[in-house]
């Protein structure tokens, strides 16, 4: 079974996990880097995206929004042009505000792959500090995964995609991290509100 087949079977077993306004889908483009570019006419903000295997998210940009259609405005004046840097294969999906990301590997990845995915998690968490990044390996987990996957919130082993108990554990794990992400976001928001309240006194 290919990695994409495992992913598609998994999403079929997870699709009822959350309800609106949250979504759970595959191959969701998630921002990992923002680049500001000054120009003579208007400044530009480039939003670069990674496509993630399975994501619990809210919509940031609808999939119908094209690469250069978004802007930051003040009244009727455009202040910044927004450029969505995503490949054409990502245009069939909404661009997401991630709460839980589940990255899937069919076999135990090598050290270089683990480091790459861990760095990817770090970049995403820099923009979305509340986001939970889970790393799922279909099969056993080697010790090097724990040594090098320092930015993963949890490393999961799935050995049989048709085992109801394993799927239940996975569902419970995703919901646990979804709750953690929402609580973290609340904490971040409360701190901002409290800070603003202090500055008004």
Pin down the residues of each PLM region.
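C-terminal tail/extension regions appended to the core domain(s) of diverse proteins
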Residues: 1-46, 126-201
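N-terminal targeting/trafficking signals and adjacent low-complexity tails
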Residues: 4, 8-11, 61, 66, ...
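Short, well-structured alpha-helical interface segments that form or flank functional binding sites
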Residues: 5, 49, 97, 109-119, ...
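Active-site metal-binding core of divalent-cation-utilizing nuclease and nuclease-like domains
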Residues: 25-94
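Conserved catalytic cores of phosphodiester-cleaving nucleases, focusing on short active-site segments
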Residues: 54, 98-106
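Active-site-adjacent loop/helix micro-motif of nuclease/hydrolase catalytic cores
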Residues: 64-68, 107-118, 144
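Conserved catalytic-core segments centered on acid/base and nucleophilic motifs
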Residues: 102, 124-125
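Short, solvent-exposed amphipathic alpha-helical segments in soluble enzyme
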Residues: 118-121, 151
């Amino acid at each position: 079974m290919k990695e994409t087949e495992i992913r598609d079977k998994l999403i079929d077993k997870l699709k009822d996990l959350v309800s609106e306004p949250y979504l759970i889908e595959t191959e969701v483009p998630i921002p990992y880097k923002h680049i500001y570019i000054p120009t003579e006419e208007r400044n530009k903000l480039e939003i670069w995206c990674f496509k993630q295997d399975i994501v619990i998210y809210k919509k940031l940009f609808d999939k119908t929004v094209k690469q250069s259609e978004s802007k930051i405005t003040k009244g009727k004046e455009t202040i910044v042009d927004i450029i969505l840097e995503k490949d054409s294969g990502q245009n069939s999906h909404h661009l997401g505000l991630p709460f839980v990301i589940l990255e899937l590997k069919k076999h135990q990845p090598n050290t270089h792959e683990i480091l790459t995915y861990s760095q990817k998690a770090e970049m995403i968490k820099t923009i979305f500090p509340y986001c939970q990044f889970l790393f799922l390996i279909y099969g056993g987990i080697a010790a090097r995964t724990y040594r090098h996957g320092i930015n993963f919130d949890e490393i999961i082993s799935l050995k049989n995609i048709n085992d109801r108990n394993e799927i239940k554990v996975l569902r419970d794990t995703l919901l646990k991290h979804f709750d953690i992400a929402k609580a973290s976001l609340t904490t971040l928001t409360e701190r901002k509100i409290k800070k603003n309240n202090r500055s008004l006194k």
